[in-house]
């Protein structure tokens, strides 16, 4: 399970700076749900060999009068759901009453907490950080988030105990190695068989009260009741194995399966972290949207995280029964307008309460999973790449035409196509999008995003003395030397 790291501290201690550095511009802000999360931000990060979800808890303004009355409810929830808490302090400002109040709350929650003294650049760090030991939360880690000094070591130091306890294997930190991976035909076939033999992990997600519990009950059968919100279970989703028409599934339920009577009595508890962790751990995501409410910003935020995670996607527009035809037409128009960027995903109009259209969901779920794990040979990918060049040549870069050499599979779920060539890193985004769409159409990929990665061809003269003559220059030099010698003899 991917760990969750919460950044906690009073305002202006550098939480947002650290958040931006951890998530990087390409991962950036994943979800910021108005009205639900208030000042919480969520991002995906990969650093020091670990993948994790990082949460910026925002405006925690603790005072000596009592942290419980000053901390926002959402920030408290972030601390409760986190696996590791990084308590940021300001080494320049020193220890404050707000720091003491926050520390008291963290001690009472018995969370795995690491004190981080930020802004240590340009000062006597050891002297400035000495007073933070009085917080009683263990060692004080020094860092300068704005400059990036100490960030990687701090993440490794804080996540290593959790990773060891959970059996998480540390990965080699380096995107290039992952991008350069090339499957042999035997490896590709073995990987596809392995994926096809595994149960499909299906995460059912959506904002509160869109019918996730009702849909899960409908899929599992009315008689199936799973207890939810027992002590100790609020942080993690429920994993429910099931079988349908000979195919095994594992439903990752983020809402909890309640008795039908209680679905209408209790406002569904929404946990952003629980949802994001379920997406990370799934193969296919089923996003449930309320037809009566249309596409909300929260839905788009969840879609953004699904796309960033590279997960296969099926969309269910729930509560479709009983809606006036004019409203249905308006909803379909809105779907075309706002969801045009995910035209690869199947959209189903269902009624979880009455079961209308629910059975057809699994056709699209299996189709999406099969597309995400399908084996495609190097020769096929190279042929498609060549056809895309024939139809639309790559642009000129510095007066030279970008040359694409070959393509191969770089991974599954999502499908990754690695294209090798000269100057490929300089290809404009418009041409990369053209190639991605060309591969999608040619491979008939449905229900899953497809990723293209580009690798520069090796330079055979790299590392050689730049003054060394070429073969033709060497021949010319010999002719000139011979000519001079003959002339001198005369």
From Swiss-Prot:
SUPFAM superfamilies recorded: P-loop containing nucleoside triphosphate hydrolases
EngA-type G domain residues: 3-166, 200-373
GO BP annotations, alphabetical order: ribosome biogenesis
CDD domains listed in its UniProt record: EngA1 (cd01894), EngA2 (cd01895)
Binding site for GTP 1: 9-16, 56-60, 118-121
Superkingdom assignment: Bacteria
Region (Disordered): 470-490
Main function: GTPase that plays an essential role in the late steps of ribosome biogenesis.
Family: Belongs to the TRAFAC class TrmE-Era-EngA-EngB-Septin-like GTPase superfamily. EngA (Der) GTPase family.
Pfam family, one: KH_dom-like
Keywords noted in UniProt: GTP-binding, Nucleotide-binding, Repeat, Ribosome biogenesis
HAMAP family: GTPase_Der (MF_00195)
GO molecular function, one term: GTP binding
UniProt cross-references to PANTHER family, sorted A to Z: GTPASE DER
Protein's name in the database: GTPase Der
Keyword GTP-binding: yes
NCBIfam families in UniProt: GTPase_EngA, small_GTP
Amino-acid positions noted as binding GTP 2 in the UniProt annotation, renumbered to this chain: 206-213, 253-257, 318-321
Subunit structure: Associates with the 50S ribosomal subunit.
InterPro entries the record matches: G_ENGA, GTP-bd, GTPase_Der, KH_dom-like, KH_dom-like_a/b, P-loop_NTPase, Small_GTP-bd
UniProt domain KH-like: residue ranges: 374-458
